[in-house]
From Swiss-Prot:
Region annotated C-terminal hydrophobic region, chain positions: 176-223
Cytoplasmic-facing ranges: 30-223
Extra facts: Sigma receptors are classified into two subtypes (Sigma-1 and Sigma-2) based on their different pharmacological profile.
A GO term from the CC aspect: nuclear inner membrane
Quaternary structure, from the entry: Homotrimer.
Chain's role: May function in lipid transport from the endoplasmic reticulum and be involved in a wide array of cellular functions probably through regulation of the biogenesis of lipid microdomains at the plasma membrane. May regulate calcium efflux at the endoplasmic reticulum.
GO biological-process terms attached to the record: lipid transport
Name used for this protein in its record: Sigma non-opioid intracellular receptor 1
Length: 223
C-alpha cells in the first residue's frame, strides 16, 4: 500500500507540475509580441494567388525579406522537404521558424488527404494554386477552398483534409511550435522510416532558430 501511495503521490505531483507548465506557456503565448501577423501573410499570399506557383513563391519570399530583414532564410538554405503526417504526403519549404511562429510554403504534386492533426497552435493557409477540401469535426459536409482563399485551423481543432494534385499554399503558424513536431514527424518515424527526411526537418528548423538568435543578438549589438 505504501508503494502504491508513493506512486500515486508522484503521479499527482507530476500532473500538478505539468498543469503549472502548461498555464505558464499559455500566459506567455497570450502576452508576448509576435513578429508576423496572420492577416498580413494571408493578404500577401492572396496578391499572388492564381499565378504560376513558383513565380508566386519567389515574389512572396522577396516581399517577406523586405518587410522582415534577418528573419527569412537565405536562398542557399531553402529546401523542399517531404512531409508525411496523418496519412497524407506533401512537401514544405520552411522560410521562418522560432519557438512561437513559422512561415512555410506547402503543397503537393499529387492528390493526397488524411487527418489534419490537433495542434497547440493556430495555423492559416492561403491557396495559391489548386484546391483544398476540408471536412470539420462534428459536421457532415466538406468545404472546398480555391486560389486566394484562406483556411484558418484554430488550436485544438481537428479536420479531414484533402489537396488536389498541383495545390500550393502559403502557411503561417502561431503557438508553441515544438508541440506540432510530434504529429508532423510521427509517420516519418514509425511508418515511412525516412530518416533522411527526419534529419532534413530538424536541420532546417535548427537553421531557422540559429538565424533568429543571430538577428536578435545583432539587434542588441552583440554580434
Amino acid at each position: 500500500m505504501a508503494v502504491l501511495s508513493s506512486r500515486a503521490m508522484r503521479a499527482a505531483l507530476g500532473l500538478a507540475v505539468l498543469a503549472v507548465v502548461i498555464q505558464l506557456l499559455r500566459t506567455w503565448l497570450s502576452s508576448k509580441s509576435y513578429l508576423f501577423n496572420q492577416k498580413d501573410i494571408a493578404e500577401l499570399a492572396k496578391q499572388h494567388a492564381g499565378m504560376d506557383f513558383e513565380v508566386a513563391f519567389s515574389k512572396i519570399i522577396v516581399e517577406l525579406r523586405k518587410k522582415h530583414p534577418g528573419h527569412i532564410l537565405p536562398d542557399e538554405d531553402l529546401q523542399w522537404i517531404f512531409v508525411n503526417a496523418g496519412g497524407w504526403m506533401g512537401s514544405m519549404c520552411l522560410l521562418h521558424a522560432s519557438l512561437t511562429e513559422y512561415i512555410l510554403l506547402f503543397g503537393t504534386a499529387i492528390d493526397t488527404g488524411g487527418h489534419s492533426g490537433r495542434y497547440w497552435a493556430d495555423i492559416s493557409d492561403t491557396v495559391i494554386t489548386g484546391t483544398f477540401r476540408q471536412w470539420k469535426e462534428g459536421t457532415t459536409k466538406s468545404e472546398v477552398f480555391y486560389p486566394g482563399d484562406t483556411i484558418v485551423h484554430v488550436a485544438g481543432e481537428a479536420t479531414s483534409v484533402h489537396w488536389s494534385g498541383g495545390t500550393w499554399m502559403v502557411e503561417y503558424g502561431r503557438g508553441f511550435i515544438p508541440s506540432t513536431m510530434g504529429f508532423a514527424l510521427a509517420d516519418t518515424i514509425f511508418s515511412t522510416q525516412d530518416f533522411c527526411t527526419l534529419f532534413y526537418t530538424f536541420r532546417i528548423y535548427a537553421r531557422c532558430l540559429l538565424l533568429e538568435t543571430h538577428t536578435y543578438l545583432s539587434e542588441l549589438g552583440l554580434s
